[in-house]
A protein has these predicted regions:
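Generic structural signal for well-ordered, non-transmembrane alpha-helical segments
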Residues: 27, 31, 98, 180-183
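Acidic/His-rich, divalent-metal-binding segments that scaffold phosphate/diphosphate chemistry
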Residues: 1-81
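Charged phosphate-binding loop/patch that engages nucleotide di/tri-phosphates or the phosphate backbone
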Residues: 164-186
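Exposed alpha-helical structural elements
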Residues: 3-10, 53, 99, 103, ...
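Charge-dense, low-complexity intrinsically disordered segments
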Residues: 16, 20-23, 132, 165, ...
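Amphipathic alpha-helical segments within well-ordered protein domains
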Residues: 9, 30, 34, 88-93, ...
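Divalent metal-dependent catalytic cores for phosphoryl transfer on phosphate-bearing substrates
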Residues: 49-153, 157
Length: 186
């Protein structure tokens, strides 16, 4: 198991508030992802999902926020918040964690398509940032339930869907597909 806490400390070195927010939020995401995984043991038994990797990647998925300008969550960088996924992927690749980097890169929203980047003129490199693997989708899904501004609170499904509608029906449809896969009875 990698020492995700040390990696987060390294990038939050002089920012105790951000470290606390990032660790708390990421732990919530990891715990939900692992709880969902516990309800689907066939994915672990088949080798399709590695629970150790899921915990590590969930803990590191938002490391890119350290480079963003989001004062409400003590992020004092210069980049737009929407960039945190690909920036986190760059950090994790530098740390020698390419598989973890893919999770960071593909967790924003329900994934960001090239069409969305062009339509919304997003300041991120033009490529498809949709989650591909079951592990990537699981962490992307679990992340939607927690905000970095309201630590300790679960977002209700209705609030998640309402927020995602701002990005179009395709975004909501992808979320609904993930819900059907991971928590079909909720």
């Amino acid at each position: 198991m990698i020492d995700f806490e040390q990696i987060i400390k390294k990038y939050c070195a002089d920012n105790a508030e951000l470290y606390h927010i990032l660790m708390t939020h990421s732990r919530q995401v990891a715990d939900r992802a692992l709880a969902i995984l516990a309800a689907h043991p066939q994915w672990v038994e088949s080798g399709e999902v590695d629970p150790v990797f899921v915990e590590e990647a969930a803990m590191l998925h938002d490391v890119g926020v350290v480079l963003c300008n989001a004062p409400k969550i003590h992020c004092l960088g210069t980049h737009a918040y929407i960039e945190h996924g690909y920036l986190g992927a760059e950090i994790l690749r530098q740390e020698g964690l390419p598989k973890h980097a893919a999770v960071a890169e593909r967790h924003t929203g329900t994934g960001i398509t090239m069409e969305q980047i062009m339509r919304e003129n997003l300041p991120i490199p033009l490529q498809d940032y949709s989650p591909r693997t079951l592990e990537e989708k699981l962490i992307c899904y679990a992340d939607k339930f927690y905000s970095k501004t309201k630590l300790g609170q679960d977002k209700p499904m209705s609030k998640i869907r309402q927020h995602l509608w701002k990005y179009g029906s395709d975004t909501v449809n992808r979320f609904d597909e993930m819900q059907a896969l991971f928590e079909p009875n909720s």
